[in-house]
């Protein structure tokens, strides 16, 4: 049985179109909806987000991020023996986006590929799942991707949500290792909070029934998020006998700078040890954590041997944390 699972490569991709708060405010003003850069930044910390063009799907973004991660890992793509894609905006109802990614990457070894849906907690759930596959000894190189095109499900008549979300993808290659990698993970859910963050529309007979756009009770999400993120982060640290002062970097889900700062403060972690990309990426749901990870790896902040705490919270309500050593 394999002892550890370790990240050996990271990658990310953002659609070229960057939409600033000023540009978005001008677009919304044409619809009679008032907002401003100051209003958005003060409530979320977001200054810009990237949105995909109409012909771009989650798999398109995922493949770009995956190619970077595989190159960084220095392995042949045919050595990937499992693909897990975390997404809430799949290309189709079925087949899975993971299968589409497999084909687009030219991986012909018939490895299993499946999607995992836990909204903004998706990447944490997927990484923890991949870790279990590797530790069981059944797989050696798992491609884990978070990818979203949330711009497709935004209600542009609701200024409280349409200004928050962006599109993008992040990926890692998680491989069997004799060195410590994933140290611990913790995951939870509470279905009694389904209604506070959801897309209530349904697909039946090829038609959408109900509201096809994202709905969020921001205040309820904020209250729950800060509470559960602190608890699940401590749960993961305690499982690995790691204290907050031993954590080099915190990578929270990039949803809202106030939630992120509140969580870091409760954990006793200084702001300079938190990776924050929300100002430039917006909330990219399952893509936010791997996007932030790749940014910090490539700019040299996160280096081999660093201890990294990732935590996410999303619709469901779902939440989770992964503690790892790079």
Curated annotation (Swiss-Prot):
TM stretches of this protein: none
Taxonomic superkingdom: Bacteria
UniProt keywords, alphabetically: Acyltransferase, Cytoplasm, Fatty acid biosynthesis, Fatty acid metabolism, Lipid biosynthesis, Lipid metabolism, Multifunctional enzyme, Transferase
Catalytic activity: malonyl-[ACP] + acetyl-CoA + H(+) = 3-oxobutanoyl-[ACP] + CO2 + CoA
GO CC terms, sorted: cytoplasm
Enzyme Commission (EC) number: 2.3.1.180
Cellular localisation: Cytoplasm
An example Gene Ontology biological process: secondary metabolite biosynthetic process
InterPro entries: ACP_syn_III_C, ACP_syn_III_N, FabH, Thiolase-like
Coiled-coil region(s): none
Chain residue ranges for the region called ACP-binding: 254-258
Family affiliation: Belongs to the thiolase-like superfamily. FabH family.
Record remark: domains: The last Arg residue of the ACP-binding site is essential for the weak association between ACP/AcpP and FabH.
Subunit structure: Homodimer.
Protein name: Beta-ketoacyl-[acyl-carrier-protein] synthase III
UniProt source species: Cupriavidus taiwanensis (strain DSM 17343 / BCRC 17206 / CCUG 44338 / CIP 107171 / LMG 19424 / R1)
Name of the gene encoding the protein in the UniProt record: fabH
């Amino acid at each position: 049985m394999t002892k550890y699972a370790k990240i050996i490569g990271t990658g990310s991709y953002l659609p070229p179109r960057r939409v600033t708060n000023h540009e978005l405010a001008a677009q919304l003003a044409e619809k009679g909806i008032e907002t401003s850069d100051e209003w958005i930044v003060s409530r979320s910390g977001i200054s810009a987000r990237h949105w995909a063009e109409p012909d771009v799907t989650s798999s398109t973004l995922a493949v770009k991020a995956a190619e970077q991660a595989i190159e960084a890992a220095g392995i042949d793509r045919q050595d990937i023996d499992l693909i897990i894609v975390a997404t809430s905006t799949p290309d189709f109802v079925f087949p899975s986006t993971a299968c589409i990614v497999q084909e687009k990457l030219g991986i012909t070894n018939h490895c299993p590929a499946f999607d995992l849906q836990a909204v903004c907690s998706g990447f944490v759930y997927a990484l923890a799942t991949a870790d279990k596959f590797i530790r069981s000894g059944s797989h050696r190189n798992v491609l884990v991707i978070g990818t979203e095109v949330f711009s497709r499900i935004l209600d542009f008549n609701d200024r409280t949500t349409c200004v928050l979300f962006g599109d993008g993808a992040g990926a890692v290659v998680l491989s069997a290792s004799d060195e410590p990698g994933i140290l611990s993970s913790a995951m939870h859910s509470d279905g009694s909070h389904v209604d506070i963050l959801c897309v209530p529309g349904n697909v039946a007979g090829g038609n959408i029934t109900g509201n096809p756009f994202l709905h969020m009770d921001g205040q309820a999400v904020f209250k729950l998020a800060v509470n559960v993120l602190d608890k699940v982060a401590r749960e993961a640290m305690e499982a690995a006998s790691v204290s907050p002062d031993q954590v080099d970097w915190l990578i929270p889900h990039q949803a809202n700078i106030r939630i992120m700062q509140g969580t870091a403060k409760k954990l006793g972690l200084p702001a300079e040890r938190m990776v924050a990309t929300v100002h430039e990426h917006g909330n990219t749901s399952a893509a936010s954590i791997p996007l932030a990870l790749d940014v910090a790896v490539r700019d040299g902040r996160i280096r081999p041997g660093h201890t990294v705490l990732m935590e996410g919270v999303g619709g469901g309500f779902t939440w989770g944390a992964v503690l790892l050593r790079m």
